[in-house]
Amino acid sequence: MAIENSKTGVKKVVLAYSGGLDTSAIIPWLKENYDNCEIVAFCADVGQGEEELVGLTEKALASGASECHIVDLKEEFVKDYIYPTIATGAIYEGTYLLGTSMARPIIAKAQVEVARKVGADALCHGCTGKGNDQVRFEGCFAALAPDLKVIAPWREWDMESREDLLAYLAERNIKTSASATKIYSRDANAWHISHEGGELEDPWNEPSKQVWTMTVDPLDAPDEPEYVTLKIENARVTEVNGEALSPYQALMKLNAIAAPHGVGRIDITENRLVGMKSRGCYETPGGTVMFAALRAVEELVLDKSSREWREQVAARMAHLVYDGRWFTPLCDSLLAASESLATMVNGEVVVKLYKGQAVPVKKRSPNSLYSEAFATFGQDSVYDQKHAEGFIRLYSLASRIRAYNTK
């Protein structure tokens, strides 16, 4: 395969490296096209699974990297990115819990930190020119390291398919476990796993069983429900079934509990940031339980106006995270607005897991505004129903005046 004209001026590049076909090809391509620059591979451990990390360093070095940095970000990812985001109530287009989107800023931040540590003058990613991730990564790079050059091979090289990449590696005697028969494009982290490609590209096709890898088919889930209890403090899950856990531990435990019940599957056609629509299947078992529990406590503790404001913050935050604008003043502002409400989101929730559903069935909070004495339809001593008459007259005053004016 033809090699493009060599580019000069780049001495050391930090590549966001996964060990997959794309990034394995990027390493030799960078050396050939950027004046034999030094390549430092960087992998973020955001909970994608130990099996994805085994042999990664050896693979990177065999492909031509001078070193490989694997950075453990699992706890930080959940504590500083996932928890603050779900505390806002952010959910993209009503269904997507932003699993891929939330991971990009912490990965980009860690990549920049590695670049500073090794004295690199460029950053590289393997995102395609059609997707959201190129914007997310480069938006973060612009905010954190505007002085570093960004290299996006998919926007430069003439390779267009897996077959092209495999041929490229074969010509250079670089071994890879990838094959041309890979069906789906997947991205996993502690929060979720996404699936795209294959038969999913036709929205008339129902996802086959082989699409799903994290959760049990709800039809095959247990015939008996399971109940899980979550303790919530300041809109963060701190205990699961009475056991105090770190943010990452809590998520892992909920994943293990909810996945066998088929909880957290969605199949959506979303509006990408770059203008096109794409179809994706997502599995977010533990996150779905967390999200439901937080909303259940909010129902108890937030008054009407606060709830409306939280919904506005949630909608704006969902688009901001999806669009890759984490490191912005607006994100800081939205998170601060959310935290002022989060101080009231304390309580305990019991969630029923059954055949793909996660339904809060019990909830209580020391900050609850719900009063059985006020809400009862029976006789009570704290609410005089006659008082409602004056309220209704004032509440409907504008309607009454409008009616008089139209006579």
Swiss-Prot record:
Protein name: Argininosuccinate synthase
InterPro entries named in the record: Arginosuc_syn_C (IPR048268), Arginosuc_syn_N (IPR048267), Arginosuc_synth (IPR001518), Arginosuc_synth_CS (IPR018223), Arginosuc_synth_type_1_subfam (IPR023434), AS_cat/multimer_dom_body (IPR024074), Rossmann-like_a/b/a_fold (IPR014729)
Homology family: Belongs to the argininosuccinate synthase family. Type 1 subfamily.
Cellular component terms per the entry's GO annotation: cytoplasm
Organism domain of life: Bacteria
Residues that bind L-citrulline: Y96, S101, N132, R136, S185, S194, E270, Y282
Keyword Membrane assigned: no
Swiss-Prot/TrEMBL catalytic activity: L-citrulline + L-aspartate + ATP = 2-(N(omega)-L-arginino)succinate + AMP + diphosphate + H(+)
Lineage: Bacteria, Pseudomonadati, Pseudomonadota, Gammaproteobacteria, Alteromonadales
One annotated GO biological process: urea cycle
Recorded name of the encoding gene: argG
Keyword presence, Iron: no
PROSITE patterns: ARGININOSUCCIN_SYN_1, ARGININOSUCCIN_SYN_2
Sites where the protein binds L-aspartate: T128, N132, D133
Record EC number: 6.3.4.5
Subcellular location: Cytoplasm
GO MF annotation, one: ATP binding
Subunit structure: Homotetramer.
Positions that bind ATP: A16, Y17, S18, G19, G20, L21, D22, T23, S24, A44, G126
HAMAP family: Arg_succ_synth_type1 (MF_00005)
Keywords from the named record: Amino-acid biosynthesis, Arginine biosynthesis, ATP-binding, Cytoplasm, Ligase, Nucleotide-binding
Organism: Shewanella amazonensis (strain ATCC BAA-1098 / SB2B)
